[in-house]
Structures are given as C-alpha cells and as structure tokens.
Amino acid sequence: MNSELFSPYTIKDVTLKNRIVMSPMCMYSSENEDGQVTNFHLIHYGTRAAGQVGLVMIEATAVLPEGRISNKDLGIWDDSLIEGLHKTTTFIHDNGAKAAIQLAHAGRKAELETDALAPSAIPFNETMKIPVEMSIQQIKNTILAFQQAAVRSKQAGFDVIEIHGAHGYLINEFLSPLSNKRTDEYGGSPEKRYRFLREIIDSINEVWNGPLFVRISANDYHPDGLTVQDYIQYTKWMKEQGVDLIDCSSGAVVPARIDVYPGYQVQYAKHIKEHANIATGAVGLITTGAQAEQILTNNEADLIFIGRELLRNPYFPRIAANELGFELEEPYQYERAPGKISTNK
C-alpha cells in the first residue's frame, strides 16, 4: 500500500526517506553545564533514527552561553562543542536518518544567573527577572553568533538547520509587539520587528547552502499580539530570503490560555502553506499514523513533526506503518521480530 507519510521528500540536495520529523525537544541533559553532548543524547537521538524517523532534529542548541534556557542545555557557541555534535550526527546517519539542528537563543526566558537579554526590558511574567534591553552591539553580536553556529553545524555534519523563532524565545520576542517595544530600527513596524530575523537569515545564508527551516509561533493567543494572518507576511519574507520550510507551532510569547486538541496547530501549517506558498511542517498532538497521513493527503503540510509521541515510543514510525498497511523496511537487526506491533499504550 502506498503512503504519503512514508514517501520521500527532497529539499535542495537532501532527501528524507519519509515525512516524519522528530520535533526538537529540550532534554536538559548536558550534566556538566558546559553545553556538551552526553551519552544520553547519543542514545536518545540514535534510537529515534533506528526507529525509522526520516529527519531527527536535535533540541534547541544555544548559539551563546547566555542564550541557554537552562544551564543544562546543549550549546554550539564554541568549536570545542563540535566533536560531541559530530558524534550525534554520526549516530543518526549510521541508523538511516538525516540530522537537523535547531539553533536558538532563549532571550528573556533564559533561566540563568546572568542577565537575560531581550528586545525590551519586559519580563515574561511576574515571577521571572526583568531582562536587559539589548544594545545594537549586542544584537549584532547575536546575529554573528547564529552565523558562527551555522558554520559549526556544517562541520558537525548536520543536513538541515532550523532557526528557532517560536515559543517566546529571543527571535519570537523581536517579532511580537507584545515583547518588542523598541523605537529604533529593530522595533515598531512589522518590517522593523522582522529585521533581527532577516539579518540572522542573511548571515546564515552566507555560510550555509543546505536546507533551512524556521520554527514560528503562528499565534500569540492575545488580542494585541500576532495572528497567523500577520505571519503570512513574515513567512513571505522568509521565502524571499531562501527559507525552505516553516515549522508551524504557536504560543508562549506571553502567558495565555490555549485550547489544545488533536492536531490543533495544523490549521497554521495549512494557512501558511496556502497563502505564503511555502512548504510547511505540522506539529502538535499528532499521535497516529492515520492522523499524519490525512494531514499530508489533504495537502495541509509537507512534513509531520512528532514530539511527545516519540518520547513515549521511539518506534512510532513502525507503529504508524503497520496502522497504514505500509511495509516498512526494517533494520536487519530487528528482522527476528516480524509482524505487527501493538498500538496499545
């Protein structure tokens, strides 16, 4: 039986064997607080590759030490971090998947002893510290850090880079009028609020010619915040700059109530795909093969990002293939366990 979910997908010169992407999820497991990969990361990501995920995207990886969400985040701010990341991509490639990295800066959500940086001195909520408004020089330094991280990503063997522009972290803070109250060239109009991301994309394009994704929060869930309509223009600009795919999440730039239900963010992937004419990834409570297949069949997205379901079961692709009646090519080491895998949890 044919399946959209298990059909290949090519972006530039990178071909994914199927449409399943491991969504980036922080593991907070750099135990020595130095940004280094640990054995846990090798097992964690290698297992999902062996489980037949097409693209394994590692967690938000900080481009600067002060840009970590926590002191146990992975980092890519120094050449000494390349070796561990290269071991990770080797594990992923050896188990049949492509490897992606999400480059990130936590902005005002950095929970470290050092000052948190943000476009404006506005805390996320009343319990978090007031961030320091970034100077122009700090902005330029951060843009350079993203570029240097892209160089290291190439050296570490990653096939895809994703820029983290979602979930209330630094880039998202610049994009949203709720967190960006600047009156200089980086704030005010949508064009000026987009400038920080524009310059990051331009800087990465100077050193990286592989597939480039951007994760966005397509809805601020606030009456004065951004909606998916606002992101149509943003994503059109991203496409003009050569971004290949928009990973469509939502929320977390300010505290907000979100009505969560199966596939609740697919609407954003569909809307941006249709109106910005760019490839999209759907993410958020996608938990079955049938659900993922329908999203692709309905042309609502091009890739399916699976998060918590892959934490629950690293062999989700095998279960999805059985569910869809698709014969998945298994690693030879698993051939002694033929037959259908139970979908019971």
Swiss-Prot record:
GO terms for biological process: response to toxic substance. CDD domains: OYE_YqiM_FMN. Belongs to the NADH:flavin oxidoreductase/NADH oxidase family. NamA subfamily. The lineage of its organism: Bacteria, Bacillati, Bacillota, Bacilli, Bacillales. Its cofactor is FMN. It comes from Bacillus thuringiensis subsp. konkukian (strain 97-27). Keywords: Detoxification, Flavoprotein, FMN, NADP, Oxidoreductase. InterPro entries: Aldolase_TIM, NADPH_DH_bac, OxRdtase_FMN_N, YqjM-like. Substrate binds at Y28, H164, G165, A166, H167. Its EC number is 1.6.99.1. Homotetramer. Catalyzes the reduction of the double bond of an array of alpha,beta-unsaturated aldehydes and ketones. It also reduces the nitro group of nitroester and nitroaromatic compounds. It could have a role in detoxification processes. This is NADPH dehydrogenase. Pfam families: Oxidored_FMN.
